[in-house]
C-alpha cells in the first residue's frame, strides 16, 4: 500500500504489478490461489491507482537449471498450475474497479520454450503479455548456447509478437533485433533507474525510435518511482552513450511524455492514451507557479518538466476522474508501514 501511495504521489496513475509470490513461506501453495493477488488489489483500491495484475510464470533457475530452494515461493510446477492461477487472478480482478488482468512469464531463462508458447496460446488473448528479455549479457550468451539464438531473436522467430506483448528491458539487442522488435508492434518497457542500479546497460533507443518502435517506462525494482526522473535518466543515458543531445525528435519533452504514455497504455492493456472527450481522466498535475515553469513559453514547458523537474512539482493526480492531492505520507501510515516491515523481517 505504501509503495502504491508513493507511486501515485509522484505522478503514476497506473501500475503493472508483476506478481511473483504464489506460495507461502515454506513453498506450500496458498489455499486460495489468488491470496496475494487479492492483497495487491486491495492495496491498489485503497490508494486509488489503476492496476494490471500480472501473475508471472517462473519454472526454473536458469537455462537448463532447476529452481533453487530460495525460489520456492514463486515457482509454477507446470503450465496447468499457472493457468489455474491466471483464472483465479482473473476472477479476483473482476471484483475490483480499476483493475485488469495481465499475464506473462519471467523470461526465456525461467521457462522452457514449449511452455512459453503454450502459455501464450492458453491465456486470455485480450490480456497484455509481459516478459523480460536480453536484460544482461550473460543471459544473452546462455540463451545463444541453449536455444541457438539471442533472446529477442528467438522471440521474433517463434512468437507472433504484436501490440499484446511488452518486453521489459530488451537492453542487449543487435541491429536486426532492434528493427524487428520495432516493426512487430510490441512495446519495450524501459526501466532506467533499475537498469543503472544493476549495471545492465543502455537500450538502443535512437535506432529503435527511428524504426518506429513503441516504448514505455517502468520502475521494476522500485529503486526509483518517479516517472519524470525515469524519463530524464533515459534521456541522459542516451546522451552519454551516443555523445548527442537529440535523443527525442521534435519537441523532446512533448515527444517523451506522449510516447511513454501511449506505450504505457498498451502495456497495461487500458489503451487509454492521452486526453479524449468522454474518456476517464488519468493525468498528473504539475505546479505552474514554480520559478522554472511560470516564466516559460508553453512550448518549452514539457522539456523543462523532463530535464529540470520531478516529484516535488507534482500537485496531484487524476485517476478515473478522481483527484488526489500529492501529500507526504501521514505519520499513521508510516507507522503502519514500519510495523508491516518489522513483521515481515521477524
Please name every model-derived segment.
Residues 122-128, 160-163, 180-189, 210-215, ...:
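Glycine-enriched alpha-helix->loop->beta-strand junction motifs that scaffold or abut catalytic
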Residues 1-28, 35, 332:
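Metal-associated gating/positioning segment near the N- to mid-region
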Residues 23-171:
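Metal-coordinating catalytic core of metallo-dependent amide/deamination hydrolases
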Residues 327-346:
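Intein/HINT protein-splicing elements and their conserved insertion hotspots or analogous self-processing inserts
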Residues 11, 44, 103, 132, ...:
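Divalent metal-coordination and catalytic microenvironments
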Residues 133-186, 194-207, 221-230:
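Catalytic core of soluble alpha/beta enzymes
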Residues 280-331:
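C-terminal cap of metal-dependent C-N hydrolases
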Residues 157-160, 206-290:
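His/Asp/Glu-enriched, well-ordered alpha-helical/loop segment
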Amino acid at each position: 500500500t505504501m509503495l502504491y501511495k508513493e507511486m501515485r504521489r509522484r505522478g503514476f496513475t497506473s501500475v503493472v504489478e508483476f506478481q511473483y509470490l504464489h506460495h507461502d513461506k515454506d513453498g506450500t501453495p496458498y489455499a486460495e490461489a489468488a491470496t496475494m493477488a487479492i492483497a495487491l488489489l486491495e492495496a491498489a483500491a485503497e490508494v486509488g491507482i489503476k492496476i494490471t495484475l500480472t501473475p508471472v510464470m517462473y519454472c526454473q533457475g536458469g537455462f537448463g537449471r532447476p529452481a533453487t530452494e530460495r525460489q520456492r515461493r514463486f515457482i509454477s510446477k507446470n503450465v496447468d498450475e499457472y493457468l489455474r492461477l491466471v483464472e483465479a487472478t482473473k476472477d479476483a480482478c473482476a471484483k475490483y474497479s480499476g483493475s485488469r488482468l495481465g499475464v506473462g512469464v519471467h523470461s526465456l531463462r525461467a521457462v522452457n520454450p514449449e511452455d512459453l508458447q503454450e502459455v501464450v496460446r492458453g491465456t486470455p488473448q485480450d490480456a497484455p503479455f509481459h516478459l523480460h528479455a536480453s536484460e544482461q549479457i550473460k543471459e544473452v550468451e546462455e540463451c545463444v548456447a541453449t536455444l541457438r539464438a539471442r533472446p529477442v531473436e528467438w522471440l521474433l522467430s517463434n512468437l507472433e509478437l504484436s501490440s499484446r506483448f511488452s518486453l521489459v528491458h530488451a537492453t542487449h539487442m543487435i541491429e536486426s533485433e532492434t528493427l524487428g522488435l520495432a516493426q512487430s508492434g510490441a512495446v519495450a518497457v524501459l526501466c532506467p533507474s533499475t537498469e543503472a542500479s544493476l549495471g545492465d546497460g543502455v537500450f538502443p533507443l535512437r535506432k529503435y525510435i527511428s524504426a518506429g518502435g513503441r516504448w514505455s517506462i517502468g520502475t521494476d525494482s522500485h529503486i526509483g518511482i518517479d516517472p519524470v526522473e525515469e524519463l530524464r535518466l533515459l534521456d541522459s543515458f542516451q546522451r552519454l552513450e551516443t555523445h548527442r543531445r537529440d535523443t527525442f525528435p521534435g519537441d523532446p519533452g512533448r515527444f517523451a511524455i506522449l510516447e511513454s504514455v501511449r506505450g504505457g497504455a498498451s502495456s497495461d492493456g487500458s489503451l487509454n492514451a492521452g486526453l479524449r472527450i468522454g474518456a476517464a481522466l488519468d493525468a498528473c498535475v504539475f505546479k505552474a507557479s514554480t520559478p522554472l515553469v511560470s516564466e516559460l513559453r508553453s512550448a518549452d514547458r514539457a522539456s523543462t518538466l523532463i530535464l529540470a523537474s520531478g516529484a516535488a512539482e507534482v500537485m496531484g493526480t487524476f485517476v478515473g476522474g478522481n483527484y488526489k492531492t500529492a501529500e507526504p505520507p501521514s505519520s499513521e501510515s508510516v507507522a503502519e508501514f514500519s510495523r508491516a516491515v518489522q513483521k515481515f523481517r521477524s
